[in-house]
Amino acid sequence: MKTREISRSLTNGVLETQRGGFSRRSVLALAGAVGAVAPFEFFGAARALTASGGGLLPHIAGAPRICRAAANGEELQGPRRQLKLAWNANSVCTAAAPVAKERGVFAKHNLDVEFVNFGGSTEQLLEAIATGKADAGIGMALRWLKPLEQGFDVRITAGVHGGCIRLLGSKAANIDSLESLRGKSIAISDQASPAKNFFLIALAKKGIDPVKEVEWRQYPANLLALAVEKGEAQALTDIDPLPYLWLKDGKLNEIATNLSGEFADRICCVLAIRGSLIRDELPVATALTRSVLEAGDRVARDPADAAAALSGYGGRGSVEEIAAMLRSHTHHNHPVGDALKKQILLYTDELKVVKVIKQSTDSTKFAERIYFDVLS
């Protein structure tokens, strides 16, 4: 059955249900449509019916309460649902997670979330989510897009914020712009880092070949500034908190961040959820996504309180320094839906230009495949 026919069958079945309850014809229409689609396709087709304001499940008498709750925007019912969320406790950009936990946002949405501080490779993290060792994770889009090409059963459900990637240049070497990096070396923490991937893109947009005209030298993250100080590199790029703290030494210029210029509205961090959780327990995935977005708004409104929540999990910097970092980010900016798919598409196109993503990848189809709307 084609998508258009599926949508027509679903629509007819629901309209009959709305007019007069269940009839034999409406039941057959709904059953036939549901049976013709894969799980994710069904969710997408059903969502198309909500455009006029109702949604599918709220109009069906006898639908499980947990499903009606999700469709109506109510809270999950019953005992709190236990979940495992993978994150990096040393990364300031994941502040929404501890805020959600410590300030009762997860509990408000009837979730009991356990943190898994993950230090392995991105592929290992995505595999952990896909196989159920964790239910979801918060991480960097520019680190995750390449591994997601491999087909992990993981879906991005929301952008979290932007602004945590910085490029710093040596004052002694007069590095104060992207153009001044032509023929220079940049210190990075790993060759697949989101910081490197972002500035590959930014340099290419300035007409600089980021592979042939710039050298990327790898060092342990905490030694990047030392490498610049010793002259082994003329610039460094990494993720807060370290770059922000190094700026205070006065030896480095902030050349750019991932909010500079045309990237002002881009996000860097995303929430991704296990595909089987979305298929089997969509209301849970919805509650988790809403919790993280609500916590992100709290971070934006009260960065000092967010810094206090985050500092309890370790990391670098005082509460005041962490709060200042959070103010420089865009924790109010967490796109979903078409806005987020557009950003994924743009990043994919840009990563293809710098040869991180395969040229054969269809950016539009890729964005559709790895994003799932759990909020509509």
Regions found by a protein language model. Name each.
Residues 142, 222-312:
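Pocket-lining segment of extracytoplasmic ligand-binding domains
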Residues 90, 118, 122, 192-196, ...:
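Solvent-exposed, acidic/flexible segments
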Residues 53-209, 217-218, 227, 234-240, ...:
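Short, glycine-/small- and polar/acidic-enriched structural segments
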Residues 1-26, 33-36, 40, 49, ...:
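N-terminal secretory signal peptides
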Residues 351-376:
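Conserved C-terminal helix/tail region of periplasmic/extracytoplasmic solute-binding proteins
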Residues 87, 160-169, 252-278, 289, ...:
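Periplasmic-binding protein-like
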